[in-house]
Amino acid sequence: MEDITMKAALVYTSTTPELIELVEKEVTKNIGTDAEIISLQDPSILAEVREAGYVTKTAAAARLIGMYMEAVAQGADAILNICSSVGEVADSVQTAAAYIGVPIVRIDEEMCREAARLGKRVGVLATLATTLEPTKNTISRVAR
C-alpha cells in the first residue's frame, strides 16, 4: 500500500523569516507533521503591488498565477495564498483551480467570513494599505 502524504503549497509575497516559520508551524499543526510543505516565494510581487497601489493588471498578478501553476506542477494538493494584498488574484483563478482539482485558499478568507458573521459593521486594520481594499471586498463578498 502506497503512503499518501498531503502536499501543501504555501505561496508567499514576502520572505520574512518569522512569517514563514509561523505559517509553516501552523499549517503543519493543522494538516499533520507528515505533510510535505512546498514553499514558493517572490517578494518582488508585493513590492510591485505596493508601488502600484493594487494588484490588478500588473505583471505581479501574472507572476503570482505562475506560482500557483508551479505549485500544481510540483504536485500540491492545495495552495495557500499567504498575502491579503494579492488575495483577489487567488479569487480570480478559482474556476481554473476547480478544473485542475487543486484548491487555492486565501489566508484571510475564514477571518473575513467570521467577521461578516459576527458583526454588522466591520473595521479593517492592516500593516499595508494595499491590503485594505481587497479585504473590504472579501468581507462584502462573503457577507452576501
Locate predicted features.
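Non-catalytic structural scaffold of enzyme domains
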Residues: M1-R144
